[in-house]
C-alpha cells in the first residue's frame, strides 16, 4: 500500500540559522515546500545568494521548492535611543517626534519613522509599540510632536514597531524601497512576492503592474495585517493570487481575541475565490529555543489545517532558531496528523453553480467522480497551474498530481494543498499519449501501482493555457500502462 503523503504545505523563513552548509538540504528532506526571504532583514545581495542556494539544494534533493520574497512594506518604527533602550513607567509623559531631525531618544521622547503620524492620530488614540508590549495614549498633537501618556511599565528599545489600535493609518502599502525591491526580486527569479500591509485591491494592482514592468510573473501574496485590509477583504482576495493570514501585526491592531474568528473568515474568503491561503506567525514559536513544540502550538497548527489553509509558515523558528530542522519535522507531523483525523468530502450542494470556465467545470466534475468512484489519484495536465488550483480548492481525499514542463508553474503549485507537481514534457504528444506517459512516470516513481483508478484531466489542444476540457477515468494496468481511455 502506498503511504499517505502530507497535503498541507510548509513555508520556512531563511536566516542565519539556515545558512550553514547542509541545512537547506535537511530542511527540504524534512518537508519544506516554499522558502521565505524576508527583505526586512539583510541586504539584497545576501538574499540573492540564499535564493541561488535554494535552487541548488532543491536540485540535489530532487524536490520542487518555491521562493517567496517578502517586501518590508511601510512598517512604522521608532528611531534609536542614545543608550539603546529606556525604562518607562505608567503615567509618564513620552513624546513621539515625527521629524528627520529628531534627536536620539531618551526617557522623555524618541523619533518615529513615519512623518505623517501626527496627521493620523488624535487625543484618546492608543499607540501600540513592540507588538503591544508598550502602550501609549495620545494626549495632544503639537505640530510634529505627539504628546502621550505611558499606560504600562516596561522597557522600550531601538527600532521597535508601532501600530495604532483599531487601525486607521493612511500610509500606502508600497514604499519607494518596496518598488525598488520588486525589480531586484524579479531579477533573482522568485516565485512569489508578498505585499506587506496592503489596504485594498489597488495596492495589489500597483504591485502587479510594477512586477509586470520588470517581466516578472511571480504570484502576488497579499498579507492581511491591517484593520483596513479586513474591511476590504473581498476585493483584496480578488486582486491576489495568494492570501496570507499575517497574525502578528493584525493581532496587535484588532486584539488577540478577534484573531481566531478572523483567521477562519480570511481562509473561507480565499477558498471561495479559488485563491491559495497561508497561515503565519508564531505557529511553533517556542521551538526557537525548545526542541519540541508546546501542546498549544500543536493545536494551533492542527486547527489551521482543519480551517482549510493551504500552507503553514515558520518564521523565527527556522530563520534564527536553535532547531530549524526539528521545527519543520514537527510541523509536518502535526499537519499529517490533523489531515488523517479531519479529512472531509466536498459538499457539492454548497459548491458554485454558475461556473463560467470549462476548466472550473472539469475540476468540479473531477472531484465529484473521485469521491463517488474511489480513485487513487487525480492527474492533471496543466500549463500555468490553474487547473491544479481549481482542483485543490475542493480538498480532495485523492492526491492531485499536477503535470507540467514549466519550472515556474511547478514551484508555484508547491504551495497548493493536495497538489504534488510533476515534471513532464508533453510537447508533440496527443492527449492519449500524454496520459500514458504521465501515468507510467507516476508508476515508476512509486506513486501508482497496478489496479489503481485514476481521474485524468487535460485539454484537447496540449500546451494551451486554460484549455482543460477533457476528463477520463483510467485504470493502471499490470504493465504500468493506462487502460480504459474512453472519454466519459
Which sequence ranges carry the predicted segments?
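Non-catalytic helical/linker scaffolds that mediate oligomerization, partner binding
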Residues: 1-488
Amino acid at each position: 500500500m502506498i503511504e499517505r503523503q502530507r497535503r498541507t504545505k510548509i513555508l520556512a523563513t531563511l536566516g542565519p540559522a539556515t545558512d550553514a552548509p547542509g541545512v537547506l538540504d535537511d530542511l527540504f528532506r524534512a518537508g519544506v515546500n516554499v522558502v521565505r526571504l524576508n527583505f526586512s532583514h539583510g541586504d539584497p545581495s545576501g538574499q540573492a545568494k540564499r535564493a541561488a542556494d535554494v535552487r541548488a539544494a532543491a536540485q540535489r534533493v530532487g524536490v520542487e521548492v518555491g521562493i517567496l520574497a517578502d517586501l518590508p512594506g511601510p512598517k512604522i518604527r521608532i528611531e534609536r535611543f542614545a543608550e539603546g533602550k529606556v525604562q518607562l513607567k505608567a503615567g509618564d509623559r513620552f513624546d513621539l517626534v515625527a521629524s528627520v531631525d529628531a534627536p536620539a531618544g531618551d526617557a522623555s521622547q524618541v523619533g518615529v519613522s513615519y512623518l505623517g503620524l501626527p496627521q493620523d492620530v488624535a487625543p484618546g488614540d492608543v499607540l501600540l509599540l513592540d507588538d503591544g508590549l508598550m502602550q501609549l495614549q495620545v494626549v495632544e498633537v503639537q505640530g510634529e510632536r505627539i504628546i502621550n501618556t505611558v499606560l504600562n511599565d516596561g522597557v522600550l528599545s531601538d527600532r521597535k514597531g508601532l501600530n495604532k489600535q483599531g487601525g486607521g493609518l493612511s500610509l500606502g502599502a508600497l514604499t519607494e524601497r518596496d518598488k525598488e525591491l520588486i525589480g531586484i526580486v524579479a531579477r533573482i527569479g522568485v516565485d512569489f512576492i508578498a505585499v506587506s500591509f496592503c489596504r485594498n485591491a489597488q495596492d495589489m494592482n500597483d504591485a502587479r503592474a510594477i512586477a509586470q514592468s520588470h517581466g516578472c510573473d511571480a504570484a502576488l501574496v497579499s498579507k492581511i495585517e491591517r484593520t483596513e485590509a479586513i474591511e476590504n477583504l473581498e476585493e483584496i482576495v480578488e486582486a491576489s493570487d495568494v492570501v496570507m493570514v499575517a497574525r502578528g501585526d493584525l493581532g496587535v491592531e484588532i486584539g488577540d481575541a478577534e484573531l481566531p474568528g478572523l483567521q477562519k473568515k480570511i481562509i473561507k474568503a480565499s477558498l471561495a475565490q479559488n485563491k491559495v491561503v497561508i497561515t503565519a506567525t508564531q505557529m511553533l514559536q517556542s521551538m526557537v529555543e525548545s526542541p519540541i513544540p508546546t501542546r498549544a502550538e500543536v493545536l494551533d497548527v492542527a486547527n489551521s489545517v482543519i480551517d482549510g489553509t493551504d500552507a503553514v509558515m515558520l518564521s523565527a523558528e527556522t530563520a534564527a532558531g536553535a532547531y530549524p530542522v526539528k521545527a519543520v519535522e514537527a510541523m509536518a507531523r502535526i499537519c499529517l496528523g490533523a489531515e488523517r483525523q479531519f479529512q472531509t468530502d466536498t459538499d457539492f450542494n454548497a459548491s458554485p453553480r454558475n461556473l463560467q470556465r470549462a476548466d472550473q467545470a472539469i475540476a468540479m466534475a473531477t472531484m465529484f467522480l473521485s469521491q463517488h468512484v474511489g480513485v487513487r489519484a487525480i492527474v492533471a495536465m496543466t500549463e500555468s497551474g490553474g487547473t491544479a488550483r481549481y482542483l485543490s480548492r475542493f480538498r480532495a481525499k485523492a492526491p492531485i498530481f499536477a503535470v507540467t514542463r514549466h519550472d515556474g508553474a511547478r514551484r508555484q503549485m508547491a504551495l497548493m494543498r493536495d497538489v504534488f507537481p510533476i515534471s513532464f514534457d508533453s510537447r508533440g504528444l496527443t492527449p492519449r499519449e500524454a496520459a500514458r506517459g504521465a501515468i507510467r512516470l507516476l508508476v515508476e516513481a512509486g506513486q501508482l501501482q497496478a489496479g489503481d483508478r485514476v481521474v485524468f484531466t487535460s485539454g484537447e489542444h496540449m500546451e494551451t493555457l486554460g484549455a482543460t476540457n477533457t476528463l477520463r477515468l483510467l485504470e493502471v494496468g499490470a504493465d504500468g500502462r493506462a487502460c480504459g481511455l474512453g472519454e466519459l
